[in-house]
Structures are given as C-alpha cells and as structure tokens.
Amino acid sequence: MSHKLSSIPQVALLFETNEQAHRDILHGVLQYVRIHGPWSLHVAEGRAGEQRLLTLGAWGGSGIIGVIQNRVYAEAVMAADVPAVLIDPVDESQLPHGLLASHSVLASDQRAIGELAAEYFLERGFTSFAFVGEIHAINWSRERGAAFAARIERAGFACGMYGALSVREKRDWVAERQRLSEWLQKLPRPVAVFAAMDARGRQVLDACLTVGLDVPNDVAVLAVDNDELICDSTTPPLSSIELDTGHMGFEAARLLDEAMRHRNKAKRVTRTFPPIKVVTRRSTEAVNIADPLVARALEFIWLNAHTPIGVPDVVAHVKVSRRLLELRFRKAQVGTIQDELQRTRLKRVKAMLAETNLSVTAIAKACGFTSKCYLGKVFREAFGTTMTRYRAERG
C-alpha cells in the first residue's frame, strides 16, 4: 500500500544515539513503528555529512520524541509547537516555563536504580560504600546517588560521595584522574563503588588502575546503562544495571501516536520505569568472605564453573584437604562446595535461557554440565519447572 509523503507522520528524535540507553529508546520506537507505522523518523543530532535538525518550528514536522538533557533541545521543542513526548528531562527549573506541563513525560526510576545498586552490594557482604556521580551533577545522577546513599545508611553504613569538580576537571579527564584516584585510595577497603553511568564507571576503573587498586578485590565497581561497547572493553569488564529504555521508547512512540491523532484530546501522561536487572561482570565479582580458604575457593568456582570442574578441582586449587575445606565452607555459611558449584552454574543457565537463543545442549556445555539430560533434571529439582517453560515465560 502506497502512502503520500504528506500522509506519513514526520517525527523528530531529539537524542544522541552514541549512548546505549538512547539507542535502546530508538529500538523501542522502531518496534512500535514497524507495527503501527509508517513514520518518517529524523534523528536531530545529525550524522557525518548532514546538518542537525534544530529549527523544528520551520521544519513542519508532526511530532517529537526527545531526551531533554539540555536547554537547546527544550527550546527546540517549545518552538516547534507540535505534540511531543519528553524522556528523562533535566530539572524543571532549567527548562522553559510550562514545557513539562504541556507534554507527556517518561523517566527512568532513579530512586529504584540507586536502591537496586545498594541491595546488590549489601547482598554481597560489603560494609564500605561510595558513589561517583556524573561530572556535571545532573539531576538523574544526584537522584541515583541520594537513593543509593539512603539505602546504605538505612542498613547502618556510611556512604562516601565524590563530586564538586572544578571547571578544568569537567573538561579534562587527566586533570581529574589524580584527585579521583587519591579519593578512592582513602576509602576503607574492600569498598563497593556505584558509578552513575557506564562512562563514569570506566573512569573509576581507570583511576583504580592508575594507583594499583585491585578490581574487584579492593574496589568493586557497578555502573548504569549496560552499554556493552563500554562494559566489555574495560579491564576488568564492568558490571552494570540494565534499564528498561527499550520499553520506554515503545511507550513514548505509542503516546506520541495518540497525541498526533487526537491532538486536543490526548491525555498527558507521567510515568517512571524501574530498572530491569544487574548484569554482573568481573568488576563486582569480589569475594567478601573473611576465611581466605573459602574466598580462594569461591573465586575459583566463579571463574571456572563454565567448565566441567568438580569438587576435587576446587580442593586442588586451594591446596588443603577436602575435609578441611568443607568444614570451612560450613563455618562460613555458604553451603557445600558442590552446592556453590551448582548454584553458580544454574545462575548462568537461567541467564542464557532468558537472554540467548542457544539450544539446551549448547547451554549445558557452556555452563559446565556433562549433558542436557542431567542439566534438565537438576534444573527441575532446583526450580520446579522445565527449561523450556522457563524460557517461554521470559519471552
């Protein structure tokens, strides 16, 4: 079916797609458009060889989806005078008067993000905590840090807060790195550091490397966005909180579609989206167990459980008798050696079932099980369901 150009909604996307969260928003928008379109989408940031799209009033488009993190984008939305959905806007005090009241607003639940980070570290036995915010102390960064610190303090611990950068430090990472490195060195170790975003988490890792702090054993680092281009390229790989930004993009497109169709009747919506989960990588795989034998055994298990190692391999690595190591495990209240091997493997199995399309045979091999039949039996005993049903329920 053909469409005249004038009949196809012209939608501007006001966000920079060099960030994972923004790319996920775009994917959510595209998913909606594939089902309910067509739309003609215009990425306002521009690409090499094309201009930016900011004179939206003269452009004559139909609607806008914008991540409003600066006044330039905010004023562009105001000038356009078309339906818009705003995502994660900065403080209202920094925006043109009336902007937020005029459009639907979707935002990540910053409090839930900070609390998830705190719970993650508390469950791992940390007693020393710190937060490193975004360099400009933007509102979402402050909210994440405040929620993180509040949850840590409710648990009875203090939380160090890093910030107050100079103008020079905001412009030049090398200028800031020494101060951040020195600050990290002064924290009681082992310390759990929550960074406001993946790019900031990468800088924390760089600062640790500069002064010889071991990650994750001296400093465990968790960030936000789960940008694989960043997280998988750091040393060690960076653990990160995955946000529900794809869903947010889909919902933004749905609300904009409704507003474009029923401009004077569409209901203004305000909604927050909680984070999905923590994606654990090496930067937080610290072993916070006082017993050094148990700590060495756990680290060996976590690093090698994807291979078909058994209890004798763990005992051989620690270089003590099996009886002594099992006794230490019981005293540390972490179950038996075999319990930990199986728990670690099943955790990996569940992640691969939910996040990949690999066959059960391939997953069994990748998680250290000798056969898919044995894995199936163990999985049913542990979770009361089959792997097929578990995967189907997670879509």
Which role does the model predict for each range below?
Residues 375:
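Binding-interface segments
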Residues 329-337, 378-390:
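A secondary-structure capping/hinge motif
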Residues 1-65, 71-317, 322, 326-327, ...:
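Bacterial carbohydrate/catabolite-sensing allosteric modules
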